[in-house]
């Protein structure tokens, strides 16, 4: 089966979505299918990779996103889809690619929309009025539900906005984690508590909450420091705040090496996941796989993923959750974190997504 996938907001230095696309594509390929990924970039390209064929089309930068690009060349994309003749279409975008569902229906192609974000949550951050924000999100989600054969959500939290409008084509399929790369390390003796914030430093991720948490813990007398792994438009502001408040924060930037990231996550006492609009949280799951408990925003989907292997806290300050986690014996909390992550292997995620595409796991690639 030829599965053509389209996505926006994917860059060499992006995180969760890029990881999900890579792992799912590699899984489709290993199962005997032909995945083709179409993404935006600074120039056109076409290459064979470990996740199958990847076609990059030149697309403009989106202001205030730290370099993300989108696909806008609709005629070019239409010609490309016609040439590729997909058996199934998988779209990981709800902005400039919403029209692809209608194209697929006209051409008799199965179309799947993967919801990697909550429109209700994102619009709610942009609009100060909950009522209009919800009405707008519901209107857009109804249009999406009508345009695609299946809507895939990775958690119940992500699915809630589609359940609210009565969408009948909704499917739950979790993402996964590389349990071999992200694994527990031998504990290292050190002085104090190490917190790690791993994620894009952008407004919707609320990274300032991690600094607030660190400041609260230190004000209570806890010897804590933090490493921030990630980059984005808020980095300069966060660095200035940390310096002004005298907070011991190391800004490591984007870590391209997965082994390097795994080593950092495994060395931490707690991973912070403060974003209120996270629909799954791959970085948090990678922390769990390394045996590190996660303290997450109670407003997000992370409580579903983390379970009892961490804590969830509402509001700007996650310090109460950190204290609760640190009160548990270290060996027990690390074992619980790893056990939780082992429920989310990529093999199971690939199988679930192939079911949505109507594909058999051992089907041979189409000619």
Residue ranges of each PLM-predicted region?
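Carbohydrate-associated surface elements
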Residues: 157, 176
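Conserved donor-binding/catalytic core segment of Leloir-type glycosyltransferases
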Residues: 186-216, 227
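Nucleotide-activated donor-binding/catalytic signature segment of Leloir-type glycosyltransferases, i.e.
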Residues: 236-255
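Short alpha-helical donor nucleotide-sugar binding micro-motif in glycosyltransferases
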Residues: 254, 263-268
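Aromatic "clamp/platform" in nucleotide-sugar-dependent glycosyltransferases that forms part
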Residues: 276
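Short hydrophobic beta-strand element within catalytic cores of glycosyltransferases
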Residues: 293-296
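A charged, aromatic-enriched C-terminal amphipathic alpha-helix characteristic of glycosyltransferases
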Residues: 331-358
């Amino acid at each position: 089966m030829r599965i053509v996938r389209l996505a926006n907001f994917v860059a060499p230095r992006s995180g969760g979505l890029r990881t999900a696309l890579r792992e799912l594509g590699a899984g489709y390929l290993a199962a005997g299918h032909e995945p083709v990924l179409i993404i935006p970039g600074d120039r056109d390209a076409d290459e064979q990779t470990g996740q199958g064929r990847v076609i990059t089309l030149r697309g403009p930068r989106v202001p205030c996103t730290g370099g993300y690009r989108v696909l806008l060349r609709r005629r070019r994309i239409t010609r490309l889809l016609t040439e590729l003749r997909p058996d199934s279409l998988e779209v990981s975008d709800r902005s400039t690619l919403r029209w692809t569902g209608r194209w697929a229906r006209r051409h008799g192609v199965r179309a799947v929309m993967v919801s990697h974000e909550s429109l209700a949550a994102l619009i709610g951050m942009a609009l100060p009025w909950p009522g209009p924000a919800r009405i707008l999100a519901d209107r857009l989600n109804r249009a999406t539900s009508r345009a695609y054969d299946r809507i895939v959500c990775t958690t119940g939290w992500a699915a809630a906005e589609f359940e609210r409008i009565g969408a009948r084509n909704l499917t739950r399929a979790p993402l996964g984690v590389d349990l071999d790369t992200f694994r527990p390390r031998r504990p290292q003796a050190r002085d104090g508590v190490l917190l790690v914030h791993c994620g894009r430093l952008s407004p919707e991720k609320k990274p300032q909450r991690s600094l607030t948490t660190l400041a609260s813990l230190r004000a209570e007398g806890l010897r804590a420091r933090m490493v921030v792994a990630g980059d984005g438009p808020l980095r300069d502001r966060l660095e200035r705040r940390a310096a002004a408040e005298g907070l011991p924060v190391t800004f490591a930037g984007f870590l391209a090496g997965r082994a390097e990231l795994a080593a950092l996550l495994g060395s931490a006492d707690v991973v912070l996941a403060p974003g209120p609009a996270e629909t799954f949280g791959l970085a948090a799951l990678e922390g769990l796989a390394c045996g590190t408990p996660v303290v997450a925003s109670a407003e997000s989907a992370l409580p579903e993923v983390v379970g009892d292997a961490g804590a969830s806290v509402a509001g700007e300050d996650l310090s109460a959750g950190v204290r609760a986690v640190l009160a548990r014996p270290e060996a027990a909390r690390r074992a619980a974190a790893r056990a939780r992550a082992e429920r989310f292997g990529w093999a199971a995620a690939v199988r679930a997504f192939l079911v949505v595409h109507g594909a058999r796991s051992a089907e041979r690639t189409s000619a």
